[in-house]
Amino acid sequence: MEGNLLVIDKRVLPEVFEKVINAKRLLKEGKVKEITEAAKQAGISRSVYYKYKDYIFEFAETLQGRKVIFNMVVTHEKGVLSSVLNILSDVGGNILTIDQGLPIHGLAHVSFTIDISTMKCDIKEMLNEIELVHGVEKVEFVAME
């Protein structure tokens, strides 16, 4: 099977997944201010919330504009960041933010936030392609909202 994403009827999943969605909803709607409070009201532990929060989404959320955050470590060489930007453009990702640290010992940390609602491929394919760029040492998925 290709990809990591599935659409599953919640009736066949453990109740904990719906509780995580409930905690996320409480935070999103401003009904609670802290994760501890949201987890308590949803009937889950904070560790359960943190374990699943970046992997569980309501179906309606997946149809809206989505954002992905990922980090990279790149070598301090001419053209590396440009190559990554070209890949993001080619797959239809819309760059929202780029944050690059100063190179230390020849390596720089770069963080991207991109809108993936118009992308032509899935996130895993995009990250795999970026990982193949000469000068990209590490690519790490951080979060999706």
Curated annotation (Swiss-Prot):
Coiled coil: none annotated. Gene3D superfamilies: 3.30.70.260. Residues 69-144 form the ACT domain. InterPro entries: ACT-like_dom_sf, ACT_dom, UPF0735_ACT_dom-cont. NCBIfam families: PRK04435.1 (NF003361). Belongs to the UPF0735 family. This is UPF0735 ACT domain-containing protein CPE1414.
